[in-house]
Regions:
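N-terminal lobe/hinge region of extracytoplasmic solute-binding protein
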Residues: 62-111, 142, 224-227
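Gly/Pro-rich hinge or "lid" segments in bacterial periplasmic/extracellular proteins
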Residues: 173, 190-254, 258, 268
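Append "and occasionally in soluble cytosolic enzymes with long acidic Gly/Pro-rich linkers
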Residues: 323-413, 502, 549-551
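Surface-exposed binding/hinge segments that line
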Residues: 119, 136, 145, 149-210
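Extracellular/periplasmic solute-recognition and catalytic clefts
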Residues: 234-244, 260-319, 342
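Long beta-strand-rich cores associated with HINT superfamily self-processing modules
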Residues: 523-551
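Ligand/substrate-recognition segments at binding pockets and active sites
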Residues: 23, 382-451
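Extracytoplasmic/peripheral linker and loop segments enriched in polar/acidic and small residues
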Residues: 16-21, 341, 422-438, 461-527, ...
């Protein structure tokens, strides 16, 4: 066992403060070892017709419990997996990253791309039989923008005229460019040409809820649940949520009538529970995937799917020492991040070449990842006033998730050996960690992000734009913002790519974050379970699941 793998032998003044870690992420994968929530059988997933029902009418799936069933409130992947089953968006994304109609049967783009009109399917109803109208869509999206309690993912609508000003409290609701022009038409005015807006509205955050939800919270409760998706909540407790097929679902009644979502893996762990036949589908860690791939019994049940996700480390750029670009550059260049990534030792995990994962439109061909260069790192550290690490202040790296601190240990080792810097490490539960990121970001932190929609801006502007809710390091750069604006407003493909490349170059130079790896998802699926095909958001729709005949 190498020194980096055995944290008990660290010859450094390293203090590991252990707090219970749980699987988490935003549109996120689980940490470190790239344990992937994105492969849970999710919603709005692979886009294909409903499959014929077989003799089996239920399935049991393991995954994190939802922190909220409200699309406008949820922001983590575990919640999105469940919410997407219960509430439908106007569009969906298939496994080839193509936008497909969902509640909207079609849409038109006019005024040079600045106006988008969505046409709802005729006869749409919620699960209780009440009519689903364009006004419900408008209400759902305005809830996301509410200035008193905006969604953590409200920035998805920033391209809409007046949307950002309204959620920031600096503009009136009446100025927001979202309106129902009839019971079936939703008209949206964009600040600039926005060819990606139909893809953006596929996000679970922008799913449609009944207009009376705020005054009738019972709509989110088991037994009285009212939704627009393929399933409704019929029972709920601390360890299991039961979903029942919505017989009024626009695409037809799902083939599997009952889905049991369990959030407690049992005393034996999820792999043993799956092997015992107690689970039909479960995500697994990359560590488990490496041995299961060679197991004669479990191997045939293993699923590996690319996931548009990135793991990155970031800094609080508003406070010393990381408000100094020289310090950030020293951390980026002073660590051999490829060695850190190699510790994950899992198929499908590769070093990042920038913030935009491979396979996402406008990923680009350039390499915008960190470059290991000790001479540069030492020079930058000296320029910041810390030659050889002398006088560097106390810093605690804080993360959350399910690994054992192996990656953090490697980072701490290299900072000590390469730059003479000693830092401490603490792991927190996801709720505490998320709250801290939003209110008082740690000096040095880690995040894994999975796309809300398949677009470069979901990994750039939404994560690093000035004032964005998910810009946890509070970084601000006018040139970066300008490049993003250019990318989003241009109708010329080459100009769009050039602008996104410029934005990535700025991130590489200024190092507000350090992209380290792109990940893949791993899961075990029972024999005969069909349709568990993730889309490019890492989600699979329960409505597309079925058991093969004879299962």
């Amino acid at each position: 066992m190498s020194e980096l793998n055995d944290l008990t032998t660290l010859p450094l003044p390293v203090r590991f403060e252990r707090v219970a870690r749980r699987d988490r992420r935003r549109r996120l994968v689980l940490v470190g070892s790239a344990l992937v929530v994105a492969l849970l059988v999710g919603a709005v997933g692979a886009w294909h017709p409903l499959l014929s029902a077989a003799s089996r009418q239920s399935a049991t799936i393991y995954g994190p419990s939802a922190s909220s069933l409200d699309p406008a409130v949820q922001s983590d992947a575990g919640s999105a997996q469940v919410v997407s089953q219960l509430f439908e968006s106007l569009t969906g994304i298939d496994s080839a990253a193509r936008v497909q109609p969902a509640l909207a049967s079609s849409w038109d783009t006019t005024n040079g791309g600045k106006k988008v009109v969505f046409h709802l399917r005729s006869g749409l109803v919620f699960s209780d039989g009440s009519a689903l109208k364009a006004s419900d869509v408008v209400n759902s999206w305005m809830r996301v923008l509410s200035p008193t309690s905006p969604s953590q993912l409200a920035s998805l609508l920033d391209g809409v005229v007046g949307a950002r000003a309204y959620r920031d409290g600096s503009g009136p609701k009446s100025a927001v460019g979202i309106r129902a022009t009839s019971d079936t038409d939703v008209e949206v005015d964009m600040s600039a040409a926005a060819s990606d807006f139909p893809a953006i509205v596929s996000s679970p955050t922008l799913a449609v809820v009944p207009s009376g939800l705020d005054s009738n919270p019972k709509y989110l409760r088991a037994g009285s649940f009212v939704g627009s998706g393929a399933y409704v909540v019929s029972a709920d407790n601390s360890s299991e949520t039961t979903l029942t097929a919505n017989k009024r679902y626009w695409a037809g009644t799902p083939a599997i009538d009952t889905i049991h979502l369990v959030s407690s893996p049992g005393a034996n762990g999820i792999v043993d529970e799956f092997q015992a036949g107690n689970l039909d589908y479960t995500p697994i860690s990359s560590g488990d995937a490496t041995w299961i791939a060679y197991d004669k019994v479990l191997g045939p049940s293993l699923r590996l799917e690319p996931s548009p996700s990135i793991e990155y480390y970031g800094f609080n750029t508003t406070k010393a020492p990381f408000n100094d670009v020289h310090v950030r550059r020293a951390f980026a260049a002073g660590i051999d991040w490829s060695r850190v990534v190699a510790l994950q030792s899992a198929p499908g995990v590769v070093s990042a070449t920038g913030m935009v994962p491979a396979g996402v439109p406008n990923h680009g061909s350039g390499d915008f990842g960190p470059v290991f260069d000790l001479a540069t790192a030492k020079s930058e550290l000296a320029a910041a006033g810390f030659p050889g690490g002398s006088g560097f202040p106390a810093v605690t790296m804080i993360t959350s998730g399910g690994d054992n601190g192996q990656l953090e240990g490697a980072i701490i080792h290299q900072l000590h050996d390469n730059l003479g810097i000693d830092i401490t490490f603490r792991a927190e539960d996801w709720t505490t960690y998320n709250d801290q990121l939003l209110s008082n970001p740690p000096a040095f932190w880690e995040m894994d992000w999975v796309a809300d929609y398949p677009g470069a801006n979901d990994f750039l502007g939404l994560l690093l734009g000035t004032g964005q809710p998910n810009n946890f390091g509070r970084w601000s750069d006018a040139t970066f913002d300008g490049a993003i604006s250019e990318a989003l407003s241009s109708t010329d493909a080459a100009a769009v790519q050039k602008a996104f490349d410029q934005a990535q170059s700025i991130v590489k130079d200024q190092a507000p974050v350090i992209p380290i790896s792109y990940g893949s998802g791993y899961a075990l699926a029972a024999k005969g379970l069909l349709g568990a095909l993730p889309n490019s958001q890492g989600l699979v729709r329960y409505a597309g699941l079925s058991w093969a005949s004879g299962s």
